[in-house]
């Protein structure tokens, strides 16, 4: 059985989602897991988001060590972890889950003539808010205005930069990740 299948069956069999498998030099096998996501129910109670714990990683590690040994998989070290604050977005469900979040997006090809002179035609990387597009696809909305630094005074006369939007499909993406924005005030429940 292929390594991908063994890992996927083991992780999903224990009730987790497989986010990513990575093989590195030196025999490192890195497995990234997450808890399954359930869309919020309209009018239902706001359920705080669950996060992967060390105990979850430990449970997966033990089971994977056994499964990989039985199959004779070649690896030196096994590392199981959560996706972290810069979680990769790969599947439609990931994008649905993180609508309204700030993401970093890299396209396979530059946007070219579609830029219509508003941004560089060679641009491939964007950071903005993920939104559902009207046609059922996805879009990222951003402003090229520099962020206001803490303590910086902003002129009342300053005109804010206009918001820009870029529609995209999953096939056009090289990579999409949650933007690593750190808030030291603690986690708060997302409004539904």
From Swiss-Prot:
Where located?
Answer: Cytoplasm
Task: Establish whether keyword Cytoplasm is in the entry.
Answer: yes
- Cross-referenced Pfam families, in alphabetical order? RimP_N (PF02576)
Q: Where are the transmembrane segments?
A: none
Predominant cellular place of this UniProt entry's protein: cytoplasm
Q: Which UniProt keywords apply?
A: Cytoplasm, Ribosome biogenesis
A GO BP annotation: translation
Keyword Cytoplasm part of the UniProt annotation: yes
Which InterPro entries does its entry note? Ribosome_maturation_RimP, RimP_C, RimP_C_sf, RimP_N, RimP_N_sf
Task: List the record's Gene Ontology CC terms alphabetically.
Answer: cytosol
At the top level of its lineage, which domain of life is listed?
Bacteria
Question: What HAMAP family does the entry give?
Answer: RimP (MF_01077)
- Relate the protein's function as given in its record: Required for maturation of 30S ribosomal subunits.
NCBIfam families attached to this UniProt entry: PRK00092.2-1, PRK14642.1
Could you say which protein family the record assigns here?
A: Belongs to the RimP family.
Name of the protein in question = Ribosome maturation factor RimP
